[in-house]
Every structure is written in structure tokens, then in C-alpha cells.
Amino acid sequence: MLKKGNKLITLKGNIINFDESFYGEIMFDEKINQINRVEKKSDDFIIPGFIDLHCHGANGFDTMDGWNSIKKMTEYHLKKGTTSILPTTWTSTFDHTFEALKEFENFKKINSNILGVHLEGPFINPNKLGAQPPLAINPSIDFINKLQELAPIKVITLAPELDNMESFIEEINNHGIKIQ
């Protein structure tokens, strides 16, 4: 989102939304305040921004590498049309994951394009790691509760075939976290 302090911003162009398109102007600050149809004067387009629900980074910057990396990757995403993201962790130690979530939440306080966190691992199958490091751990709701205190976890990627996963999944659902 464009932020210019408390100023009202006006953009004019071909507005494309879900069910129609027309030439108009959008006036907004933190949210859209008004949309008007106006006479066409340019070929610019105004479209909804993209939302990336599984984002490990961008332009060489990784979500797990601290505040500056998060800032640089969100700036890059915004320039390319992705207006909101769920920064996605990779399987790591509790301390490293804890620090990453703390940085996400600190950054979110000054930049509203982080919608929450996508936790990828560490509850993954050690025999099917893919690109994840071999740090898989057993399901632990205490682990999730400690991380939830730092930043809102919206999605967890996990291996449902692991032992004790059924009750863990039920508990995760009770927290309102989506499972992938």
C-alpha cells in the first residue's frame, strides 16, 4: 500500500475489480475512501494487489534473516504488485524461528503488508524433507503457543501422517490456524 502520512491519495486509471472495469479515480489513505467514475484521460490501470501466502523471501533476501531482509523483500514485492504477504519460515531451531517471528512482528508494527506468518515445519516428515533441513520435530502445541505470543501464525505446513498429529491438528484448528 502507498503510505504518505495522513494524506489522502488519489489515483486515476482503468479500475479493474472482480466483476467490472471502468475508468475512474480511487481516493484512499489507510483504506479506500471513495471510488468515482470519471472521464478517461490515460491508459493506466488500477488493479487489486497480489497476496503471497507462501513467501520465503525475494530478490536475495530471506524471511529468516532479520528486520533488514524483511524490509528489503517487502519493498521488492510491493514494486512487483504483491501488496500483502505471509512471510514463510523454513524448518529451523526454536530459537531461530522465535527470532524470525519477533522480527516479523516488529516490522509489521510499521508496515501493514504482513498479514501474519506461514510456519513451514518443523512438523514435517523426516523422510520427505524436500528442501527443508533435517530438523523436523514432533508436534508440540507448546511450541506453537510460544510462537503465537510473538506473531499471529495464520498457516502451518505439516505432515499429517506423523504420530500424534491428529490431536495436534485439532488443537491447531482450535487456534484458527489453517493447515497445509
Where are these regions (language model features)?
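A conserved glycine-rich beta-strand in the N-terminal activation segment of trypsin-fold
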Residues: 20-28
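Divalent metal-dependent hydrolysis catalytic cores, especially in the metallo-beta-lactamase
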Residues: 56, 71-100, 113-125, 151-161, ...
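Active-site mouth loops of central-metabolism enzymes
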Residues: 56-68, 130-138, 180
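Generic structural signal for well-ordered alpha-helices
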Residues: 74, 98-105, 144, 169
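Metal-dependent catalytic neighborhoods of phosphoester/phosphodiester hydrolases
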Residues: 62, 95-105, 130
